[in-house]
UniProtKB/Swiss-Prot annotation:
This is Endoribonuclease YbeY. PROSITE patterns: UPF0054. The keyword Transcription regulation does not apply. It comes from the Bacteria. Binds 1 zinc ion. The gene is ybeY. GO terms for biological process: rRNA processing. The lineage of its organism: Bacteria, Pseudomonadati, Pseudomonadota, Gammaproteobacteria, Enterobacterales. Zn(2+) binds at H114, H118, H124.
Length: 157
């Protein structure tokens, strides 16, 4: 039996309109049990200032970003289900959903799926890795009832 443990931290000045803890739990449960039976993840919802500071400190990028993934790596002799932390910036997610003409809840789900795959070791540095990761993301999003996250909902193609 699989188990996903969520530690949800809301560090946004305004928590109105955020997805529910149940939403985040459902999104994690659509991803993590596919790869390991027991997982623990912290999701921290932040405002742009905190996202910007973390992105600058850990990635050298002087801007806020949608999601940051911080995988936890225990020493090899210690087995823990802790995968790591996802830091998701509310304002960036909301802005991107508008710009990309996507349903807001679907974009939140995509950020959780995308970030979770990073915690599991997936990346998109080169084209082959990106293609594999996007395929997995799209399958998971479809399983959740959402459209392909890489196609705008208003895209005529």
């Amino acid at each position: 039996m699989s188990q996903v443990i969520l530690d949800l931290q809301i560090a946004c000045a305004d928590s109105q309109g955020l997805p529910t803890e149940g939403d985040f739990q459902r999104w994690l449960e659509a991803v993590l049990p596919l790869f390991q039976p027991v997982s623990e993840v912290t999701i921290r919802l932040v405002d742009e200032a905190e996202s910007h500071d973390l992105n600058l400190t850990y990635r050298g990028k002087d801007k806020s970003t949608n999601v940051l993934s911080f995988p936890f790596e225990a020493p090899p002799e210690i087995e823990l289900p802790l995968l790591g932390d996802l830091i998701i910036c509310r304002q960036v997610v909301e802005k991107e959903a508008i710009e990309q003409e996507k349903a807001l809840l679907a974009h939140w789900a995509h950020m959780v799926v995308h970030g979770s795959l990073h915690l599991l070791g997936y990346d998109h540095i080169d084209d082959e890795e990106a293609e594999e990761m996007e395929l997995i993301e799209t399958e998971i999003m479809h399983g959740l009832g959402y459209p392909d996250p890489y196609i705008s909902e208003k895209d005529p193609d």
